Amino acid sequence: MNKRTISSLIKCFVLLILLLPTWLAWDVSPAQADYILVTTPFDPAPDGCTVSHCSLREAIILANETPTTLDQIYLPTNTYHIERSGNDDTSVLGDFDITSPIEIYGIEDTPSSVVRIEGNQLDRVFEVTGSNGDLWLERVTITEGNQPLYNGGGVACYHATLTLEDVVIVLNSSPTHYGGGLAADHCTVTISNTNITNNTASDGGGIFANVSTQSLINSIVYYNHASEVGGGIYTSNSDIAFYAVTLGDNDAGTRGGGVFQIGTTSSLFIDHSLVSENHAKAEDGGGLQISEGTNLTIVNSTISANVADTFGGGISTSIPTTINHSTIVNNHADMNANNDGYGGGVLAYIGSGVTISNTILANNTDHSAFHYNDCAEYVGVDVISNGYNLVESVGNCTFNSTGDKKGLDPMLGPLQNNGGWTNTHALLIGSPAIDAGNPSVTRIQFPNSDQRGPARYARVINGQVDIGAFEAWLVTFLPVIFR
């Protein structure tokens, strides 16, 4: 049996244990350390898990003694504090060091109960290291971590593997380094059904990734802050993929309010996602600042209401970029109106080649004298239309391909919950984007649903796809004949 199957079989047994008096001890010896129940929220000097006492720190130390064997640790509803300050790599002091395969599960007594693990501002909460380091976290909140000397205020991963499932990472900080919530260096990271919020760092307020692979699925990265670059995410020479992600309300002191990307081998793939209300306070890329990399791909997604004080309110990209079936609206560039930047919606900058199809570019604002509201090309850079775009204000870009519509109001609803995984701008009745997309796109072709995701939000209705990230469901009223 794999570890997921084993986990399911033992959960019923663990719940029976919890029906016994609170903090009843479970005898766990090093020879039988596959499943460990933590019995105290306190963090004393570790002296081993015994019949009467097992702390989270002691459970982790015990699990690390078998570096190639999977151990599962269960945490009943409570708040677990780091109380032992210091710096080592053995979990005796400071953060909890993971050097072997470990799964940690919070056991919530009620739907409203929370399992919290707090750093107490003494250190980050978890550090996952080494070739055997493999941490699976599920149903826990990581908070109050602080690491002023190194990367990763809440969680750090170095040359290891990390999985977050149904986790909240909130109010952690790395004030002079990278990754307020999470820092990954040479790691494989999977983040699912997780909120990363209100974390702070010098760079990468929510997440920092260096030479890593990260997948974010059905997760939220919002209200994070970087004093320099990458309010939500800072990525360097890493492969990042979003699916059903909301990246919103993050801010950076200079560039990349939502995402800042550098590194010649970096790539970013955004699908069925929302990038909204991020702010680059002094420079470029309100939503996305893509400075280096191999490619940027945006499909079935919305880039809305982001702000850059200079270039590229929604997107500023300097690498090959493909945008398809997306909606880019209500973004702002050169917010100070001092002619220090331009490109309200999309800016194709030095080194890029941007290809756009089946996409709405509208209601963006370039506050400079250039007024390149929806699209801007830097000198010597081309934005290529592959057709079936609706662009209200073309700026200095050219949209003359088959199916392109120019100078039209797309007639969008507000950004709100219209069903599905992320907020969207609905197409209102009478929108010129309805049934105006590429007719060769059929129901069975990719993408097979609009941004909202589930199959009930089909990508093609009435026989022809709509332009943008949202597919309108329109009701046809037949005339009633009275006799």
Per-region residue spans from a language model:
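Conserved functional hotspot residues at active sites or interaction interfaces
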Residues: P479
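N-terminal, post-signal-peptide segments of secreted/periplasmic proteins
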Residues: W26-N151, C157-H159, T163-E165, N339-D340, ...
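Short, solvent-exposed mixed-charge patches
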Residues: F482-R483
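Bacterial N-terminal signal peptides
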Residues: C12-A25
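Bacterial N-terminal signal peptides that target proteins for export
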Residues: N2-V14
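Predominantly extracellular beta-rich ligand-binding scaffolds that present long acidic/polar faces
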Residues: Q72, T161-D166, A184-I196, I207-Y223, ...
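Conserved positions at the start
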Residues: D123-V125, G152, G179, G204, ...
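Leucine-rich, hydrophobic repeat-scaffold detector
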Residues: Q147, V168-V170, S174
